[in-house]
Regions:
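Short active-site oxyanion
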Residues: 35-39, 72-74, 110-114
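Short beta-strand scaffold positions
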Residues: 6, 40-41, 77, 98, ...
């Protein structure tokens, strides 16, 4: 049993069957469940994933909330340590936006085994100083 951390794109892809990342997101989440991994989503990424459903209304938001509860996906709050690590990542890697730095920092602070993202622009795990394997969908 390990810890799989997902970014917003994975949850968005899982929820939207028309999304280019749907099948890969589905496989990533079911794989984590099959391994009995804890699945964690940073609170910042959860907020990002709720933007589209929020535009569609409260019922769409409820669908996401129910999925998160059923899977279950743990929502990791933004802590001072995560914020500090994200700032250091952002300062060192100028191409990484703050939302992505928060996801990476959460993986680092939680010592995740696997970080699943739809972003292909991130530096390697070695350059990021991560123990986690990065899976890019």
């Amino acid at each position: 049993m390990g810890l799989t951390l997902i970014d917003a794109g994975v949850l968005i892809g899982f929820l939207d069957r028309t999304d280019a990342h749907h099948a890969a997101s589905y496989d990533a989440l079911t794989g984590a469940l099959d391994r009995n991994d804890r699945i964690v989503l940073p609170a910042s990424a959860y907020g990002e994933a709720l933007v589209g459903p929020s535009r569609r209304g409260s019922k769409a938001v409820t669908v996401v909330e129910q999925l998160v509860e059923r899977v279950p996906i743990e929502i990791e709050p933004l802590s001072q340590a995560i914020a500090r690590t994200a700032a250091m990542i952002r300062a060192k890697h100028r191409s990484i936006r703050l939302p992505d730095a928060l996801v990476i920092a959460t993986a680092k602070e939680l010592d995740a085994d696997l970080l699943v993202t739809t972003d292909h622009g991130w530096p390697t795990r070695a350059k990021l100083g991560l123990r986690a394997t990065i899976t890019r969908l």
